A protein has these predicted regions:
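Non-heme Fe(II)/2-oxoglutarate
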Residues: 2-111, 233, 255-256
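Catalytic core of Fe(II)/2-oxoglutarate
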Residues: 155, 166-256
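Short, solvent-exposed loop/turn and secondary-structure capping segments
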Residues: 58-62, 135, 224-227
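Glycine-rich, acidic and aromatic/proline-enriched surface loops and short helix-turn segments
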Residues: 52, 128-129, 162-165, 194-195
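Short beta-strand segments enriched in hydrophobic/aromatic residues
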Residues: 38, 50, 138, 163, ...
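Non-heme Fe(II) oxygenase catalytic core, chiefly the N-lobe of the double-stranded beta-helix
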Residues: 51, 95-147
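Short, conserved beta-strand element in jelly-roll/cupin
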Residues: 123-126, 142-168, 218
Length: 256
C-alpha cells in the first residue's frame, strides 16, 4: 500500500558537464563491479528500510525545445524515494548512503582519473512487470535528438548499490558491450553515463528488486588526458579519506 506520495524533483543545481560524450571510449573495461562493497550490516539495514518503505516521490515529466520527452515521470511513479523524502523518513539512511559515497569516491576518482562529486541518493523499487529500455544517463541516444542532453546532463558517471537478489529477471544489460548479468547484493557498480554505455534492465518476473542509484559529476580530470571543451570551473574540491578501505576492482567481462 502506498501511504504517501511526496511531490519533488530533487535535481542538482548543476546545469552542465565538463566531460564530453565519448570521453571514456566504449570499452567494457570501463564498467566496474566491486563485490561485497557494503558491509552486511549496511546492506541489511538499507534493505530492511527499502522493503518496508511506503512513501515515494511524485515528480513531473519534462520535454526539451523539440517536444522530446527528456524525463518521463510516469515510469517512476510510486517507485522512487529521493533525498528530500529519505531525510523526512530516516536520517540514518541518508547518513549510511553518504558514508558509502565517501568510500566509493576514492575508487571512482582513482579508476577514471577524476575528482567527482556524487549526486543525492535515492532508493528505487522494481516490482513485477517493471523494466527499463536501453538509455544513456546524461543524454538522448536515439532519433533526431541523439547526442543532445536529457534532463540530467551532469550525470557523467553512473553508480549503483544493489540491496537484494531474491527476485527473478531484473538483469542489467549493455547492448554496445554485449554483456548482461544479475547484479550482486552488497555490490557497487559504476560506468560512464554517455550514449556509448546505454544500458537497460530486463523485466522483473517475480519478487521486488531494490537499488540505490546515484551519479557522479566530474569536477576535474586529474591526468594528462583533458576534455577539449571545458564548460565549468568548480571551487568545491572534495578531500579524499586517507583511511578508506581498500577495494579490489573487477571489470565486468563479456560473456563468451
Amino acid at each position: 500500500m502506498i501511504e504517501e506520495r511526496i511531490p519533488t524533483n530533487n535535481y542538482e543545481s548543476v546545469q552542465g558537464s565538463i566531460t564530453p560524450s565519448g570521453f571514456f571510449g566504449n570499452s567494457v573495461d570501463m564498467i566496474v563491479e566491486l563485490e561485497n562493497f557494503m558491509t552486511e550490516e549496511e546492506q541489511e539495514f538499507l534493505f530492511n528500510f527499502a522493503s518496508n518503505n511506503t512513501t515515494w516521490d511524485y515528480t513531473i515529466s519534462k520535454k526539451n525545445e523539440n517536444g522530446t520527452v527528456i524525463y518521463d515521470a510516469d515510469i517512476w511513479a510510486d517507485r522512487v524515494a529521493t533525498l528530500h523524502t529519505l531525510q523526512k523518513l530516516n536520517q540514518k539512511v541518508v547518513d549510511t548512503v553518504h558514508g558509502l559515497f565517501d568510500r566509493l569516491k576514492i575508487e571512482v576518482d582513482k579508476f577514471y582519473n577524476v575528482n567527482a562529486k556524487a549526486t543525492s541518493p535515492a532508493i528505487v523499487r522494481w516490482p513485477v512487470g517493471t523494466r527499463q529500455e536501453p538509455h544513456a544517463d546524461k543524454e538522448l541516444h536515439t532519433g533526431p535528438d541523439a547526442g543532445k542532453p536529457n534532463d540530467f546532463p551532469w550525470y557523467d558517471l553512473a553508480g549503483l548499490f544493489y540491496l537484494n537478489d531474491d527476485y527473478e529477471g531484473g538483469e542489467l544489460y549493455f547492448p554496445n558491450q554485449g554483456i548482461q548479468f544479475k547484479p550482486k547484493p552488497g555490490a557497487a557498480y559504476f560506468f560512464p553515463g554517455d550514449m556509448n554505455y546505454v544500458h537497460g534492465v530486463t523485466e522483473i518476473t517475480s519478487g521486488i528488486r531494490y537499488v540505490i542509484p546515484f551519479f557522479w559529476t566530474i569536477l576535474k580530470h586529474t591526468n594528462d588526458k583533458q576534455p577539449d571543451n571545458g564548460v565549468y570551473k568548480w571551487d568545491n574540491v572534495l578531500v579524499e579519506d586517507p583511511n578508506h578501505i581498500h577495494i579490489v576492482m573487477k571489470p565486468i567481462k563479456r560473456k563468451e
